[in-house]
């Protein structure tokens, strides 16, 4: 039995969960999310607890057991608390400006880089070099933050670029001068 998959998921007050065959719908104060459960995995709702089970010990169902449980737990956390990733911009002249719900970055290129906020994601500028990506879908928040970071990855020599707020950049030693 999977160590993670066998743990029951408690459904907090104010969250409504519906299990309809392979479709799990979670509705909470911040919004609604759905997940399609893969074939061998079964989800059961008893009062205010969800249990994820697998019919056999085949490799495919073992690997999906813990994953499915974690994905459902992430849905519940998303609709109650939400997810947020903070990013920092380091470098001379590097900055971010809010243009409505979109962002405009100055990252040392010959042109400003515009980023549109996808549906369900909130982009907030907290200063000229700080921004946050927030939403209820953990995967989407992480993907948008990674795409913003990819615009100018942190340089290993000078440390310039866009990084996560808690990220530590491993610096390389430059060539030795004479």
Curated annotation (Swiss-Prot):
Transmembrane segments: none annotated. The keyword Signal does not apply. It comes from the Bacteria. Keywords: Ribonucleoprotein, Ribosomal protein, RNA-binding, rRNA-binding. SUPFAM superfamilies: Ribosomal protein L6 (SSF56053). GO terms for cellular component: cytosolic large ribosomal subunit. One of its GO terms (molecular function) is rRNA binding. One of its GO terms (biological process) is cytoplasmic translation. PROSITE patterns: RIBOSOMAL_L6_1. The keyword GTP-binding does not apply. It holds the Pfam family Ribosomal_L6. Disulfide bonds: none annotated. This protein binds to the 23S rRNA, and is important in its secondary structure. It is located near the subunit interface in the base of the L7/L12 stalk, and near the tRNA binding site of the peptidyltransferase center. Part of the 50S ribosomal subunit. HAMAP family: Ribosomal_uL6_B. Belongs to the universal ribosomal protein uL6 family. This is Large ribosomal subunit protein uL6. The gene is rplF.
